[in-house]
Amino acid sequence: NAIRFLDRVPTDRRNLIQLGFKHPHYNLDCPDRFYQMYDPAAIRWPTIASPEDYFGPQPGFAVYEAAYIANGRWTPEKSGDEAWRQVVRAYFAAISHVDHEIGRFLRALEASPIAETTTVIFLSDNGFNLGNHDSFHKMSQWDSAAHVPLAIWHAGMEPAEVAMPVSLHNVPKTVMQLAGLPPRPDWTSGQSLLPLIDPAFGRYDDSLSPVTSVFGTLSVRPSAEGYRNL
């Protein structure tokens, strides 16, 4: 338990806590009070892309459904409005449950002896299209699927916000630079994100763009402004 570890954490050496949550992956089971935060009747369908922005059924998505969603036999948007609302409600509830647990950990960290010497990196592996663009999957670079939380807190670092799309491949080299260590020579992917926060850390190469390649599909999210399909 991460909170119990903070009660006995050694302060004379480096420590690493990797705190992961399955939610909001299926199954979307959490304490009832989090479901009660959301009224299914108040949930509205997201804006569907205009015809010229919707690229239609893709073979890769069919493979994804077959592998992950009941062999392709069921997805919420195929089962009617009420089924979709209940799934989205459960998805939101699962996120709120994670928010609650993260808050518990951060409060415990703030009260611990390592609060001022600890770096916190908060991220998610992917978002999800909950009907956005007439889809119910994650295999795309649309904002609903690719725009995930990525936050870095480090004692003494001035707050800054970065709008540029970046890749999670950058996180390992960011951690190493924060620790004052060189990246491993076999890490050929990614770059440290710290120059985006403070130029004193060096230069960030913004000519590189996040890419997703899975199930025979390829999506590119250019870092340059002006190339964005929301």
Mark where each language-model region is:
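An acidic site on a long C-lobe helix of protein kinase domains
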Residues: 167-171
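Active-site-proximal cap/lid insertion segments
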Residues: 1, 5-117, 121-165, 178-187
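C-terminal cap/loop subdomain of S1 sulfatases and analogous C-terminal strand-loop tails that border
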Residues: 126-132, 172, 177-230
